[in-house]
């Protein structure tokens, strides 16, 4: 769920997720293609896109909402939630953003997707 993912990012990084990551590089935000621009784009967004693509099995496509909570500043995805795997993908990306704040480059914010060429590596 995009809203829940945004809340995870905000709490992990202290950054507003939509302007900060909504159109960053070649993979952050809607759709993704081309060669990732840096560790934030590659390790976080590219891996997140691949994770969500691979984890769509048990979660209804019409409703990808999931439950989660915080325990000692750690995201805990709902154990019996049918969308738990998607929650885990979002959690991993939010933590990745925090761990890679130092690689964030403002020049890739609002990056034109037309500049993103064919991907060098598949999921």
Swiss-Prot record:
Keywords: Calcium, Disulfide bond, Hydrolase, Lipid degradation, Lipid metabolism, Metal-binding, Myotoxin, Secreted, Toxin. CDD domains: PLA2c. One of its GO terms (cellular component) is extracellular region. Optimum pH is 8.0. Its main location: secreted. The active site is at 48, 90. Inhibited by divalent cations different from calcium ions (cadmium, magnesium, manganese, zinc), since they act as competitive antagonists of this cofactor. Disulfide bonds join 28-45, 44-96, 50-123, 51-89, 59-83, 77-87. One of its GO terms (molecular function) is toxin activity. It is an enzyme of class 3 (hydrolase). Ca(2+) binds at residues 27, 29, 31, 49. InterPro entries: PLipase_A2 (IPR001211), PLipase_A2_Asp_AS (IPR033112), PLipase_A2_dom (IPR016090), PLipase_A2_dom_sf (IPR036444), PLipase_A2_His_AS (IPR033113). The keyword Calcium applies. Binds 1 Ca(2+) ion. Optimum temperature is 35-45 degrees Celsius. Its cofactor is Ca(2+). Its EC number is 3.1.1.4. It catalyses: a 1,2-diacyl-sn-glycero-3-phosphocholine + H2O = a 1-acyl-sn-glycero-3-phosphocholine + a fatty acid + H(+). It is found in: Secreted. Lys and Tyr residues play critical role in myotoxic, neurotoxic, and cytotoxic activities displayed by this toxin. In an other hand, His residues are relevant for edematogenic, neurotoxic, and myotoxic effects, but not for cytotoxic activity. Monomer. Snake venom phospholipase A2 (PLA2) that induces in vivo myotoxicity, moderates footpad edema, and causes in vitro neuromuscular blockade. PLA2 catalyzes the calcium-dependent hydrolysis of the 2-acyl groups in 3-sn-phosphoglycerides. This is Basic phospholipase A2 Ph-TX1. The lineage of its organism: Eukaryota, Metazoa, Chordata, Craniata, Vertebrata.
């Amino acid at each position: 769920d995009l809203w829940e993912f945004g809340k995870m990012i905000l709490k992990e990084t202290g950054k507003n997720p939509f302007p900060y990551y909504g159109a960053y590089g070649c993979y952050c935000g809607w759709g993704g293609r081309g060669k990732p621009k840096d560790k934030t784009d590659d390790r976080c967004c590219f891996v997140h896109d691949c994770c969500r693509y691979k984890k769509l099995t048990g979660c209804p496509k019409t409703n990808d909402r999931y439950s989660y909570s915080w325990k000692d500043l750690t995201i805990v995805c709902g154990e019996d939630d049918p969308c738990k795997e998607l929650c885990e993908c979002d959690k991993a990306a939010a933590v990745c953003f925090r761990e890679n704040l130092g690689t964030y480059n403002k020049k890739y914010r609002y990056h034109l997707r037309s500049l993103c060429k064919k991907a060098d590596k598949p999921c």
